[in-house]
Amino acid sequence: MNILVFNGSPKKQRSDTLHLSRAFLDGMCEAAPQEIHAIDVIDRHIEFCRGCFACKYNGSHCVLDDDMREILGQILASDLLLFSYPLYCYGMPAMLKNLVDRMLPLSSMAMEDVNGRYVHVGQRDFSRLRYLRRHRTIRRRVGRCLFRHLRHENFSIYLQ
């Protein structure tokens, strides 16, 4: 499995959140061989989305010439996306939110009903990423783990 990790912490490799994500990845590697690629988002040049929607009309190519072109290619080649980030002001850090906003070329303007919710249809087939939906609860559980006074606790129960 090809795993792409987005490290959204400004602390880069010293991030407590990344430490916990590494434990998750180590467990995945014990179960089966994995190919892991990590991106420190703070080190990448990613401009802000202009909202021009040119990517919707020119074959999903963004008009901005920055590192997102390479990152979008890596996303398309991945089987699993892991977003590792600390919670700042109840959400992800701005640099990671910017990266998520720039994933707009991967969706289309078309909408479809999925379990009573309308969502944008992808411009490409992302069916192999369905694995993420089953692990949605990991985010909630892991998010509660990183309080300073709990830093040295054993979190392996949350990763099972």
Put a short name on every predicted segment.
Residues M1, K12, D26, E30-A31, ...:
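Glycine-rich phosphate/pyrophosphate-binding loop and the adjoining helix
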Residues M1-S108:
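N-terminal beta1-alpha1-beta2 submodule of the flavodoxin-like/Rossmannoid cofactor-binding fold
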Residues G8, V41, L129-R133, L159:
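Cofactor-binding loop segments of dinucleotide-utilizing enzymes, especially the Rossmann-like FAD-
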Residues A110-S156:
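Short, glycine-/small-residue-rich phosphate/pyrophosphate-handling segment
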Residues V5, I36-A38, F126, N154-I157:
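Conserved beta-strand scaffold positions in the cores of enzyme catalytic domains, especially
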